[in-house]
């Protein structure tokens, strides 16, 4: 679709000329007969906050471990700061890593844990005090500098590990779900602070997470992975609004998947008829043009559905379930063909409450109904 092609050209123009911090070239990692990562190629640029996002077992942590040097690729090349990392041990790579395990020194207090790398590097004492103080303030540990890890909660221990990695100002910081032990409020606050810090110091962050909201909040770009392969690489808005395939559409937020057969095609628009006889208009992104008679899937986000309003596509439905979510209400709707539709309505205005069993119409615009094409990476 032209709007996606235009968006990707603009993104490419922004990236062009920026030095590459980490390059993965046709990287494959096998453990015996199991392929954890398959033919992965990525360019991650200097100063970029880049996330590897996917479900458990998709290969994202294995990818991070290959960049860090804890795993060697079976095939392909890992390049950091223009230098091949083949045979380079972890401690000689210009990266620091924060994994889910804290790995703190139990006999050292918070200050000394954070300062450990600086002391080994011969940083002057005054500079150590200043930088450790800044790092502790960043992760909300000011006043905890003289506590031992045994006197800290799990979340506080994770923040010490994060501060210790940041204080050395590496060229690339690798993070494997470092905020997982924090409570929800602090986690959201730390997301913004991590992003702000990354902008301030210019360090490339490569962040592994299964949390879609976390990735969307912090990332400049995201690589969505599944079964060892990259499904799509894009900025957060493009991933959400223009998913490349069904997996990305399903994994990034909620979506309604409509299956049908193409009846007509005109430009980027197509008419789809579902198995239940619904006739719907949709658009084909990525330059993909379905053929008449072709079986396709289309995706439309719940917030794009309007209950009781007009639109390109209007479907009679029955309210099956109502879920109050605070800022919005979620409606589970039963379509005439027996399919299920999910709609979200913002609770920002007075509106008649709908009840289960009530007959309603639900509408959405064709431009918000995307025919899902082939895989993109």
Swiss-Prot record:
It is an enzyme of class 7 (translocase). One of its GO terms (molecular function) is ABC-type putrescine transporter activity. GO terms for cellular component: ATP-binding cassette (ABC) transporter complex. Signal peptide: none annotated. Its EC number is 7.6.2.11. ATP binds at residues 54-61. The keyword Cytoplasm does not apply. Keywords: ATP-binding, Cell membrane, Membrane, Nucleotide-binding, Translocase, Transport. Pfam families: ABC_tran, TOBE_2. Disulfide bonds: none annotated. The keyword Heme does not apply. It is found in: Cell membrane. CDD domains: ABC_PotA_N. Residues 22-252 form the ABC transporter domain. It is a peripheral membrane protein. It catalyses: ATP + H2O + polyamine-[polyamine-binding protein]Side 1 = ADP + phosphate + polyamineSide 2 + [polyamine-binding protein]Side 1. Part of the ABC transporter complex PotABCD involved in spermidine/putrescine import. Responsible for energy coupling to the transport system. NCBIfam families: potA (TIGR01187). Belongs to the ABC transporter superfamily. Spermidine/putrescine importer (TC 3.A.1.11.1) family. The complex is composed of two ATP-binding proteins (PotA), two transmembrane proteins (PotB and PotC) and a solute-binding protein (PotD). This is Spermidine/putrescine import ATP-binding protein PotA. It comes from Rubrobacter xylanophilus (strain DSM 9941 / JCM 11954 / NBRC 16129 / PRD-1).
């Amino acid at each position: 679709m032209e709007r996606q092609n235009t968006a990707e050209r603009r993104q490419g123009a922004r990236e062009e000329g920026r030095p590459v911090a980490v390059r993965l070239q046709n990287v494959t990692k096998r453990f015996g007969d199991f392929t954890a990562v398959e033919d992965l190629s990525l360019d991650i640029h200097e100063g970029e906050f880049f996330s590897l996002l996917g479900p458990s077992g998709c290969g994202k942590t294995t990818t991070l471990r290959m960049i860090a040097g804890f795993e060697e690729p079976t095939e392909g090349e890992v390049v950091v700061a223009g230098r091949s990392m083949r045979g380079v041990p972890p401690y000689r790579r210009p990266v620091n890593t924060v994994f889910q395990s804290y790995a703190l020194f139990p006999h050292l207090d918070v200050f000394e844990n954070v300062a450990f790398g600086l002391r080994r590097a011969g940083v002057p004492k005054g500079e150590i005090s200043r930088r450790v103080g800044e790092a502790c303030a960043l992760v909300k540990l000011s006043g905890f500098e003289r506590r031992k890890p045994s006197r800290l909660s799990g979340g506080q221990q994770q923040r010490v590990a994060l501060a210790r990695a940041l204080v050395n100002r590496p060229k690339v910081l690798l993070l494997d779900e470092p905020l997982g032990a924090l409570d929800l409020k602090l986690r959201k606050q730390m997301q913004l602070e991590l992003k702000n810090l990354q902008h301030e110091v210019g360090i490339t962050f490569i962040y592994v997470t299964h949390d879609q909201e976390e990735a969307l909040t912090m990332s400049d770009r995201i690589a969505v992975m599944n079964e060892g392969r990259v499904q799509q690489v894009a900025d957060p808005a493009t991933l959400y609004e223009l998913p490349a395939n069904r997996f990305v559409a399903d994994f990034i937020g909620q979506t309604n998947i409509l299956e049908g057969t193409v009846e007509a095609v005109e430009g980027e628009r197509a008419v789809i008829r579902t198995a239940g006889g619904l006739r719907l208009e949709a658009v084909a992104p990525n330059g993909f043009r379905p053929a008449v008679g072709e079986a396709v899937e289309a995706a439309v986000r719940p917030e794009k559905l309007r209950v009781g309003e007009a639109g390109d596509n209007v479907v009679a439905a029955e309210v099956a379930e109502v879920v109050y979510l605070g800022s919005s209400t979620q409606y589970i709707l039963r379509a005439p063909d027996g399919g299920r539709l999910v709609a979200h309505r913002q609770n920002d205005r007075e509106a008649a409450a709908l009840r289960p069993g009530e007959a309603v119409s639900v509408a959405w615009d064709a431009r918000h109904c995307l025919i899902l094409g082939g895989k993109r990476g």
